[in-house]
Amino acid sequence: MFAPTMRRLFLFAALLAGLAALPLLAAAPAASSGMRLGIKGYDPVAYFTLQRATPGQPQFEYSWDEHVWRFASAEHRALFKSDPVRYAPQFANFCAVALARGEVREANPEYWLISDGKLYLFGKPYGPDLFRKELGKNVERARHNRELLKDQEPGR
């Protein structure tokens, strides 16, 4: 009676280990496609609908503009598919403040601002306030510098 119980326990443990590995397998499409994760895997639609930075899930991915985008739900993925330009951050994975200064720095998805229906990401917590102070000038500078620095996307 002891041996069958141990065997069942072992099989149960093996099953649990296999289930625990499923999220790692689900994450494979972004890595195996050779494309970068857009905004480190955060859901771009959630900034607009939930008003917060929300990690996306590997089962809700969509490839667009040389990035793999992740979403918190199938509904968010469908919204993005219908109008990706509306939901994608203005400067991909760039920090908007750094870009306005002519620098290349990766954005942190936790620091963000929506202004005039556009999503901007920043590298530091004070980024949104700093960018907002001279919004028009900063957007113009960042757009100009984005074209000059587009081949230097952070993390490439």
Which residues does each PLM region occupy?
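Bacterial N-terminal signal peptides that target proteins for export
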Residues: 2-13
